[in-house]
């Protein structure tokens, strides 16, 4: 097996946090919101210029496609809150049993939710390395 030897280096610590969420798609955004709402110091890293992942970057527009079956039980939670906030702004379209969100308005909704929760937002960044002692 080949190895790459890296010289010792000093890397400045940009910030410290209790919870670091990398990626702000529906799952990452929900995880960061849940942690911050529990009072935990939370940072959210996103490589693009806005939060929302597939909702805002690929124009999928929904996270509830699974509701097409009438037997589906919806757990509610933060995903339902995304939809409710979009409805309040007339920024969603009901199709069958789910909502298609206006992707541009959802960018604003996601920003507001991040700010309201007190999350430290980090846009246009990627995670390269986590130091071993703090890896979880």
Predicted regions and their residues:
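Beta1/beta-strand and adjacent pyrophosphate-binding region of the FAD-binding site
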Residues: 13-25
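The Walker A (P-loop) glycine that initiates the GxxxxGKT/S ATP-binding motif of P-loop NTPases
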Residues: 22-23, 46-47, 132
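N-terminal Rossmann-fold NAD(P) dinucleotide-binding loop
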Residues: 28
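Residue-level detector of conserved catalytic or cofactor/ligand-binding positions
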Residues: 126-136
